[in-house]
Amino acid sequence: MIELQSPANGETVSILTDIQKDFIRNRSFEKLRANDEELVDWLGLKQNMEGENSAPLPVEFKWTSDDKSRLNFVLQIATDRSFEHPVRRILARKQEASVFNLENGRQYFWRVFIEDTPPDDAEVRSFTTAMDIPRWIFIDGCTNVRDCGCWMTASGRRIKQGLLYRGSEFNRHHAVTPAGRYALVHDLHLKTDIDIRGKTEIHDGFVPPLDENGIKWVNITVEPYGEIDKPIWRKQYREYFTFLSNPDIYPAYCHCWGGADRTGTTSFLLGALLGMSDEDLILDYELTSCAIYGARKRNFKLFNDMLNVLDRYPGGSFAEKGTAYLKDIGVEDKTLDAIRSIFL
């Protein structure tokens, strides 16, 4: 007989660590713009592994069994009680398992049974993952990985999760592990690797790191912050957002080197287009501070260079100014509407 222990039936489970919760709780938004001119070298990132706090908590499953003769248990997780829509099937020799990367704000059902036996009589329990923001993702070998979804918008709609992820690169300064590859393919169901790094970071003979997993690689080079106003990068940002309007590319993963500056700029503009509040746009940028590449703060001179560019556009919010910027660089209204229809 197998008896389920945890999560408790009906429990709500948070995947945020205490450090992540404290970081969010301690943000002050009385002052969205800062006058300090602290610098960040986005092309000379330094790793500090002691500062790695971007990984989420797993959901911990535990059970007991009085059957000592069998080796393998099967943990099955689904979004429906009849298990017609399973999301995980995990073989476990111990009476416990740690599961990462479940969606936030969703009810799940779970059961455990002995391998090669019918699960029909297995006990079924449910739990709900908290609607934590952000939805941090664990990809072994990478850092600063999170879902661009879950945020609320001014329209009252929540940005859909499971479509676009952001994070660090998979090669060079990082090396995604086999377990990380498995998560990208089987947890995130990734279709597209959107690489926004420059040509100097992509060497001759480069083989896309996820090529062997059947994930399409696309390179659209951009530069961050105030560079968004230069003609060459206006063209590149137009290409990037036009690419995002294709629903067939999702789920997709956007990255530069550390998922901080170039990725932070693209994410800021996307969040603005979708209607995120000024406070949430600032918070999303600063959340990179939880990763290994040091703090990202609103008082960085380069970040304020970007805001100064956006200030030249009409509107009372970053959402309005960011949308006006995208229109000005040539992203068509139908393209912007297509992106909104995908994410909202």
Task: List each model region and its residues.
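Cys-dependent protein tyrosine phosphatase-like superfamily
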Residues: 1-253, 265-344
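Ser/Thr-glycine-rich phosphate-binding loops at phosphate-binding pockets of nucleotides
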Residues: 258, 262-263
